[in-house]
């Protein structure tokens, strides 16, 4: 086994404001009562403004490859995405097996309503008119057949292809680290050059693109509907900039099938979204492979990169989140180096 490099991430949950920390989050609202999941292989298409045309055909979303492998194609539509909620009663839009690959699309925020031409006033209205609801458009849920509570879901990011445009904004006087500075808010739309993998933020200011999903997570164990904003033991809105193609997420499973979502797609991000947002985009292709890991339970998510492991901690109290991240790091080191937790803590120093 080679050297281990550790990066710890902490998330602070506070009420309604973006604050210091790698990921800064809104307060978790209470659950909305909901029924048990309907674990059917299809989802009824009921797009507003169109007549119902019947259930989507699962077989028409699956491509069989040589060697017995399967690739599932999941477009982002109003029928395959949710706006701002995780809900473990949501009917799965796709059913796959452990080891399968999924090629999925994602939307821009608020069901593709934040696109070039949308004003900051309109963006503010999308936030203030729907209290408790997150801004993220989430593709899913995806039901993984073998996944059961107590298992771990391993999600490997194979490839990410963004759209050619993106945005950065902060809502007037409400969120981010600068609400008093930008009381009128601001929105900026950007062209993403996918050949050079850069964007010109300002004349002469070029930002390299490093796309990653800001949100990827599974259903909570508690029934009900929850905002997409806070992360937690189910992963979710982690906003970890190192979660790029070539890395792997390990997340505990809490409900049968795991129920996997992804969205909040980023083209690039600093180490924290201090003005509220990163370079927000949508993905033409988010290519992932899912595997179910049995007999190796986790209590919090981890990310494996080609050169490091990332551990996490989540709490409303930043100090408690930091303590969780430290404990998770010591736990990982003790597992991989077969040393005591006490020696692992010394090694961390």
Q: Over which residues does each language-model region extend?
A:
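Intrinsically disordered, low-complexity linker/loop segments enriched in Gly/Pro
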Residues: 136, 159-244
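Short, structured beta-strand/loop micro-motifs enriched in basic residues and often containing a Trp
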Residues: 77-87, 131-139, 226-234
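Gram-negative bacterial Sec-dependent N-terminal signal peptides
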Residues: 4-25
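Conserved mixed alpha/beta catalytic, RNA-binding, or beta-rich assembly cores of soluble enzyme
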Residues: 211-237, 241-319
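N-terminal, Lys/Arg-enriched amphipathic/low-complexity engagement segments
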Residues: 57-130
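Short, Lys/Arg- and Gly-enriched loop/turn segments at beta-strand edges
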Residues: 109-120, 160-170, 257-267
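N-terminal pre-domain segments of enzymes
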Residues: 28-80
